[in-house]
Every structure is written in C-alpha cells, then in structure tokens.
Curated annotation (Swiss-Prot):
Disulfide bonds join C24-C48, C27-C35, C42-C76, C82-C101, C102-C107. The gene is Ly6g6d. Residues 22-121 form the UPAR/Ly6 domain. It comes from Mus musculus. Homodimer. Glycans are attached at T68. It is a lipid-anchor; GPI-anchor. This is Lymphocyte antigen 6 complex locus protein G6d. A lipid is attached at N108 (GPI-anchor amidated asparagine). InterPro entries: LY6_UPA_recep-like (IPR016054), LY6G6d/LY6G6f (IPR026524), Snake_toxin-like_sf (IPR045860).
Length: 135
C-alpha cells in the first residue's frame, strides 16, 4: 500500500479515535464579568455560544420605563438550540433568552484561542507530505 495513503488513513483514524469535543468559556449561568478563566468541555451535540437573557417588562413596568437588566454570558449551547429565542417564566417574571453559537474551541470570548486541535495538525502534516513527496 502506498505510504501516502497509509498516512492519510492513520490521520483519519487518529482524528476519529481521539474525537474532539469543543472547549468553551462558561459562567455557570451568571453574568460574564471575570468568568473567562472558566473553561469547560462541551458535551456531544453542543457548541460554544452566548446566552443573552433579559426580563420582559410587565404591564406596570411598561407604564414606567426604566433600565432593564440584561445578562450576556458564554456557555455551551445544544446545537439544535443555536440562534433560537426561548421564553421562560420564573415566578411572575418572564425572560427572553437568545442562544447564539460560534465555531471552534474557545470561540465565545474576545480572546482568540491559540490551541490547534491535534486532528487538524495531523491532517495538515499529512496533506503537506502528500503534496510534497520529497519529504
């Protein structure tokens, strides 16, 4: 069997065997101030994202507008909930939660990640070896 083909197959198997779950910043449901040091590994079927949660004004609050407290925090989001709005009631307060997703490790922060997943690195090395047979 061709050594290049063996390399490609090994890289593919390595990527599948290791798997890759996304690592994300998480605040445990709290506001995003100083939570960027908390890194969690999302479960299967989850991606990094942000939750924007704000209470809906009651009829009394609508008559007297005031500042509305809105929470924006990073979290793992189920893929099927990405870019959706959910309405939930807690006691007599109704909240609207917007769930937005992003792609890649630690993408739900302003700080870019410098960590390259092993399977991408292996694929890049294999591709270079395949394109440059003299290596």
């Amino acid at each position: 069997m061709n050594s290049q083909l063996v390399g490609i197959l090994l890289s593919a198997l390595l990527g599948v065997a290791l798997g890759h779950r996304t690592r994300c910043y998480d605040c445990g449901g709290g506001p995003s101030n100083s939570c960027k040091q908390t890194v969690i590994t999302c479960g299967e079927g989850e991606r990094c994202g942000f939750l924007d949660r704000k209470p809906q004004p009651s009829s009394e609050q609508a008559k007297q507008p005031s500042a509305t407290l809105s929470h924006h925090y990073p979290a793992c989001v189920a893929t099927h909930h990405c870019n959706q709005v959910a309405i939930e009631s807690v006691g007599d307060v109704t909240f609207t939660t917007q769930k937005n997703c992003c792609f890649g490790d630690l993408c739900n922060s302003a700080v870019a990640s410098s960590v390259t997943p092993l399977c991408i690195l292996a694929a890049a090395v294999t591709t270079l070896a395949w394109l440059l047979p003299g290596l």
